[in-house]
Each structure stands twice: as structure tokens, then as C-alpha cells.
Amino acid sequence: MNRLTRSIGAVGVSLLFAGSLAGCGGSSDSAGTASAGPMDASKANLPKTEADVNGTIDKSKVKKSLVVGVDNPYYLFHHDIEVALSKGYFKEFGIDTVEIKTIEDPLPPLIGGSLDLALYDTDTAIAAARKGDQNLRFLSVYLGGEANVLGVGKGINSGADLRGKTITGGQFGSRNDAIIRQLLRDNGVEPDRDVKIVSTGGQSNERLQAVITGTVDGASIQLRHRTVLEKAGGKVLFEETREVPQSGWSATKLLQESPETVTAFLAATLKARQFITDQANKEEVLTIMRAKKFDIPTEYADAYAAENAPAYHVSDGGFKPADMEKFIGDQIAYKTVPEGTDWRQYTYLLPLWRAQKALGLPLNPALADM
């Protein structure tokens, strides 16, 4: 995912946001009311300089209990919250409890109001905002790297061996489906001519098992699956990695009712992420997550350095605008995002900038880059 840059003057026009949100420059949260409607961007107190960003979180305005949705049961998508709870980071910013609900698609309950925030695919959230919920906003990147990996079963050692075989990238129309097709083309294999592409549900763990059991001959899998697949007699045939702001946090009702809470949530989880991406803390993080009953076999633990690298599990929650521009452009081409979508219109970065400033981190994206 990649991006183009625009002048700071464009921020006031393109970063539209729902509700009367707290201004960057002051500590006031008085406009964050549930009754507020979409705000005229000309009235928005958006930051023009870093000095305008208020890094002080008023805990008296923070909601004490939150319910958030995550689409993946793998520990990587839960450990920011569990570590923040374990180490007291949420309480530091005024939040007492956070309940995580694992839901295959957390956007409907987020839009319906039963979730406060959702961790989900960036493009899907932006597309949902464009198509329906005008108050939904993408807030911060969670995973900023993408590994496009084709795992195959026994006896497949080259692109030529794939001819006539069955491959899945997950559900038709998903990003995984699109990028596995591109990976095949990049390696001289034409989808739907040289191989049979099938649609399957579930996450990457289910696709791995489908390869191991022979249900399919190859599938889009994750880096952590390499050792497991090799022990079963398979292998990674093709792979590529790139910077892509593929998933992150979004909010709608909470952003209108209590923008201070959104900032507090991001500050606590980013503080946890700073701890997690410090490789010296690997064993403590894994101990916390195993105590929470997450299944982390040795093969998955061995992938910790790759999956929790600061550029992959983005340590500051930010992104390069050019990467986002490229990503959303690709998704428009894949028809998963409506034609003409301007991602800036459905992205609201003030809570992220405030959280970064609260933690003493540089603002990312930089104001000048937006």
C-alpha cells in the first residue's frame, strides 16, 4: 500500500469526521456529544502544526469499560490489549476494562453500536464508510506489512508442478484471493487457466490445514505456518513481502460520543505495542498470552520476530500516505473498494496523533505529509 502527499491545507477538506470532535489544540472535549451530526470541515479545529496537537488525555472524560471486536483468534491480534491490561497501561489512561469479542466480521456490530472499536481490514472499513456508515472512520494501522505466501502440499516443487492443481486464497473477492492470483502470475502461473482457484471460508490456519489434509493443493498462508507445513511434507513455493497498511482500528459511535476515550485506547495499546515490538520482551509477552489460554506452539513462537517487527506490527500505529494511496488504489482495481473512494475522507487521525504525542512519539503520518 502506498500513498501520495498533499499539502496541509487539504487536511481541513479531506479529513471529514463525524460528530463534534475534540480540537487538537485544546483539552476541551465539550463538542463530543452523541447528538452532534456530521460537522462542517470548515469548523473543525484540525491541527496545522505539531504544537496544535494536545497530548494530554483527560481521564475524567474517558469511558471506563469498552467492548472491542477482532476478526482473528490468533494471539497476534489480541496481544496489544492483553499486554496493556496486564501491565496497567489502560488504567494509566483512564480505562478499567476492555472485553474482546472475536467475530469474523466485526463491522456490522460496530456500526450497530454493540462494539466500541473494531480491528479489521483497512480497505473493508473504508469501503463500509463510503457505502453506508458516514460516521465510520479508520483510525490507526495495526499490521503494516503483508506477506503473500503460497504454501503447497507434497510433491509440488515448481510452478510447472502446479498445473491442474487446486489453489485457494480464501473467499472470492477478498484481498487474499486477489494477491494470491497476482503471486501466481508473477511466477508464470496463470490463474483459472493453469490452476483451479476455489473459494474457501475461514482464516489462514484453516487454509493451512486444507493443504496439509490434501483438501486443496496450495493456499495463501502466513509466515508462521512455514515450519508446520514443512513438517507435514509441504513447502512454501512462492512468497513476497511488502509494506501495506492492511489492518487497523476503526470506530464510529464512540468517536462521536467520546473522542477522549478513543485517544486513551490508542495510547494504551500503542504503549503495549512499543513493549511488544521490543524483541527483548518476547518471552514475557508470550507468557502473558499463554496465561490467557492462547495456543502458541513453538513453530508460531519462532515467528515472533517477523510478526512483531516494528515495521510489520506497526509500533506507532502510523503509515506512509503514499502506501495508503497505493493500497486503496489496488483495492479499487480489485473491486473491493468503490471507484473514486478518497481514503482521506474516511480516515480520522487526530486521536492517533494525540496518542503518539502522549507517548512522546513523532507524529506519523507527519502533518506535512498529509
Question: PLM features: what roles do these ranges have?
Answer:
Residues 21-36:
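Bacterial lipoprotein signal-peptidase II cleavage site
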Residues 78, 82, 107, 122-125, ...:
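Extracytoplasmic/secreted envelope proteins and their assembly/folding machinery
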Residues 98, 104-106, 196-198, 302-309, ...:
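Short linear loop/turn motifs
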Residues 42, 329-370:
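Conserved C-terminal helix/tail region of periplasmic/extracytoplasmic solute-binding proteins
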Residues 1-22:
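Sec-dependent bacterial lipoprotein signal peptides
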Residues 258-340:
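Secondary-structure end/capping motifs
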Residues 197, 203-294:
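Pocket-lining segment of extracytoplasmic ligand-binding domains
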Residues 32-200, 217-220, 236-242:
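Short, glycine-/small- and polar/acidic-enriched structural segments
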